[in-house]
Design a protein with these regions (language model features):
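Nucleotidyltransferase catalytic core that binds NTPs
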Residues: 1-137
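Short amphipathic alpha-helices and their capping/turn segments at secondary-structure boundaries
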Residues: 13-22, 162-181
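A general structural motif
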Residues: 23, 152-154, 182
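Hydrophobic faces of well-ordered beta-strands that scaffold small-molecule active sites
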Residues: 28, 155-161, 183-187
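Short active-site-proximal "capping" loops at secondary-structure junctions
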Residues: 33-36, 162-165, 189-194
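A generic structural signal for short, non-catalytic loop/turn and secondary-structure boundary residues
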Residues: 107, 150-152, 180
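N-terminal amphipathic alpha-helix/helix-capping segment at the start of soluble metabolic enzymes
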Residues: 131-173
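Glycine-rich, proline-tolerant flexible connector loops at the mouths of alpha/beta enzymes
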Residues: 172-197
Length: 197
């Protein structure tokens, strides 16, 4: 089992699939919009488009819905022998996700397999372009409307300079096995308050 949180399949994802095939049938979880906004960023395509994209990857046996950033519920449901992920989840806030998956899979004798993370300048550039696309005003308005429908509480931070903007954008906090981050930032421009989601 592995899980994808992406709008675009790149070499790193294909590497995970290739490595996972060595252990048997590959089941891929696709995070729902609700889970994705808690984990990484707002999706640029719908859950169903992401699911279809993953289903079309050679080597994927089955695609399942993952409705949480934590893996325990889906692991208990499908009981994979292995949970395979890039080793980027071994440190930082993502470590809580790994620990959650490890506890769930080891409860019945399964194993975690950490694959060396694929560092590629093209992947970094792709990520930068996706974030730039999400920064366009028409996407921000659309995202805010969607976010208000997905999240019971939208967390925003008032930003008044570049540093506080980066804090709002980059901060991810792990607390008691859960990850959290800001959903939006309030920007005060010449007495006009703007919400950027």
């Amino acid at each position: 089992y592995t899980c994808f949180t992406t709008d675009v399949i790149h070499a790193g994802h294909l590497n995970i699939i290739h490595e996972a095939q060595k252990y048997g049938d590959v089941v891929v979880g696709v995070m729902t919009d609700k889970a994705l906004v808690q984990f990484d960023r707002f999706p640029t395509i719908s859950f169903y488009e992401r699911k279809k994209m993953v289903q079309e990857i050679t080597g994927v046996s089955e695609v399942v819905e993952q409705d949480s950033i934590m893996y325990d519920t889906v692991i208990r449901k499908i009981k994979p022998d292995y949970v395979i992920h890039g080793d980027n989840w071994c440190k930082g806030p993502m470590k809580a996700i790994r620990e959650n998956a490890k506890k769930a899979v080891e409860a019945y004798g399964g194993k975690i397999i950490d694959i060396p993370y694929t560092y590629d300048p093209q992947i970094k550039e792709l990520s930068r372009k996706m974030r730039a696309r999400l920064a366009m005003p028409e996407y921000r308005r659309k995202r805010l409307k969607q976010l208000l429908g997905i999240r019971p509480i939208v967390k925003a931070l008032e930003v008044h300079n570049g540093i506080t903007g980066l804090i709002a954008e980059k901060t991810v906090v792990e607390h008691e096995g859960r990850l959290d981050q800001f959903d939006a930032m309030w920007i005060l421009l010449r007495e006009i308050l703007v919400l950027v989601a």
